[in-house]
Amino acid sequence: MISRQRRLLLAGTAAAALTPRIVLAQANPGVTATELKIGTTTSLSGPVSALGTINKAQGAYFKMVNDQGGVGGRKINYLILDDGFNPAKTLEQTRRLVEEEEVAFLFSQLGTGPNSAIVKYVNDKGVPHLFLSVNGDKWGDYKTYPWTLPFAPSARTEGQIFIKYALQQNPKAKIGILYQNDDLGRDFVAGAKDVLGAQYDTVVKAASYEVTDPTVDSQLIQLQSWGADVLISGVTGKFGAMSIRKVSELGWKPQHFITSGAASVSSTINPAGPERAVGLITSVYMKDVTDPAWENDAGVKAYRAFMAKYFADGNPNEFYNAYGYMTGMVMHRVLEQCKGDFSRKSIMAQANNLKDLENPLLLPGIKVNTSPTDHRPLEQMQLQRWNGKQWERFGAVIQGAAV
């Protein structure tokens, strides 16, 4: 029979063996023996509240992960705070997440303005600031923002891809760029310079507009008069429809590219007139879950099953829900790679260690890659052309230029 003293000794040894794990969990913000607490800010109210569904879909994805046992022996607690797309509120809510809630990291915060308000704060604090819902290229600046990672291809990458394809079709092309005079538009210009280098000044003419301008007619007339046979519209919102309509009215027939952010059928193509947009080219990196071509695709079917079970109130045909599901899946992969070490340093190291990661909602051939010196996870896209009724993908996946 084991003596009382021997039982106490064994119990003490077992407790000592468990202590390092308990201390480690307490030492890492957001981590307990049973929970991993993470956080985000988004627009659940305000002018772009519809985009809040991205984070709701992610929350539903993490619920599915928890039902399947969690990650690293812990359940994910995803805190979603409303900032109303107000940068000052974003900073307030982010400080609450970091200083009061003590989250392990921040995930998929929405918007250029809101993220600009917090990026210095979170980098100074050493808090992983992962897979932002933004499209500006500055977020890939790993030297300035080592704790920050965007996700979607930037406008700069898209500009590179448009230029590469245009030159492949016509090496002597004269390229006109219509761009919004902000970070988004300037990213398109930067993308052209990345590809063309010293040739840029001789083969490109760029014309900018302000978001307050009533039209972009004069800029387009200027580019046509210069002799552009390729037109890249680095525009947003109504200016996409305006550029399509004016090019048609001018009887101008350039090879016309438009940013994916302004390629919506409902807000751009239909207001311009579907027949005016025939031949228009844009880019894409995700499967369109509403496209009959993907109806029997295993990844899309799994997404629809997920929506039915875990986010029944959400619209399965909504792009932003598919995006939320996909980014949730990528974040899940990062956490799995941590192998139970959820220190902020470990989480950032694994976010910087994605190698040719495939995702069931990415187009075939498009993969996620990161490293400590590559904070642009997606740098590949495929082109698609408007046929008068719908977008049709064509050609191979194109890689952006090395920057």
What is the role of each PLM region?
Residues 8-25:
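N-terminal export signals
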Residues 25-38, 72-75, 167-172:
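Immediate post-signal peptide segment of exported/extracytoplasmic ligand-binding proteins
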Residues 30-31, 39-59, 81-88, 110-111, ...:
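Extracytoplasmic "Venus flytrap"
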Residues 50-56, 68-141, 151, 209-216, ...:
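Beta-alpha junction/loop-to-helix N-cap segments that form part of ligand/metal-binding clefts
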Residues 83, 130, 136-140, 211-212, ...:
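Venus flytrap/periplasmic-binding-protein-like
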Residues 88-92, 137-141, 146-251, 293-298:
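Extracellular/periplasmic Venus flytrap/periplasmic-binding protein
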Residues 247-323, 397-401:
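Extracellular/periplasmic periplasmic-binding protein-like sensory domains
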Residues 309-322, 332-391:
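Segments of small-molecule ligand-sensing domains
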